[in-house]
Amino acid sequence: MLTLYTSGTTKAPKTVNHTWDDLNTAIDRSIREIGLTSNDTVLDVFPANTIAHYTITAMPAYRANATLVSAKFEANHYIKLFKEVQPTYIALIPRHWELLKEVDSWKTFNMSSVRYMVTGSGPVPQEMIDDFKSKGVQTVANWYGMTEQPPPVFIGYNSEEFDFEPKEGYAVDFLADGECIINGFATGDIFDVQSRKFLRRKDHSTGSTWKTI
């Protein structure tokens, strides 16, 4: 069993447990979606106490026998490391993008080696997606999911709008206020069902996490 201690919605750590069987299912789902093979190079900046590290980057890379490059995120170092390893698959969240934009070389940065990029962990602006596309990223996949319900539950391709057809193993409903319910689990995430966009958390996050670096 894997036990994760997260602190997103509140400052108090939240404990989430996953069996290895469930994690293996999520890892295999990610490998199929990304199309990961031994020819890929994965650049991973997700901390080890996040579900993303296990089901989006590190473990899928291991299972697919891909090359895994793991580093703590720092904007200048990320750009330097990217140039060195030329990854074919990356995963970044909106906060990473905000920090990368502060680097002078970002405006002309070439990311054409990337055939698939995952983003998510909160509302993703179309401006961010378009920025990465303009730098050569072939597919920017906006994955929705969470620690309790590992992503991807559903995906938006090159768009902040999601395809609400859930991936295998998930049943999704929406309450009248737009809150997403996954396999009976109340997520606390509010969507605009008409536009198919992730709007906000139901309760404002007060925790200090890797997402607020």
Residue ranges, per PLM feature:
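Catalytic cores of nucleotide-enabled group-transfer and carboxylate-activating enzymes in metabolic
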Residues: 159-177, 181
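Conserved ATP-binding/catalytic segment of the ANL
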Residues: 179-213
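Short beta-strand-to-turn element immediately C-terminal to the catalytic PLP-Schiff-base lysine
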Residues: 17-19, 153-157, 175
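Short beta-strand->loop structural element characteristic of the AMP-binding/adenylate-forming
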Residues: 14-17, 44, 65-73, 141
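Conserved AMP-binding/adenylation subdomain of ANL enzymes
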Residues: 25-41, 49-89
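Gly/Ser/Thr-rich phosphate-binding loop
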Residues: 89-92, 101-160
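Alpha-helix/helix-capping structural signal
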Residues: 21, 95, 122-123, 186
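Conserved AMP-binding A3 loop
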Residues: 1-28
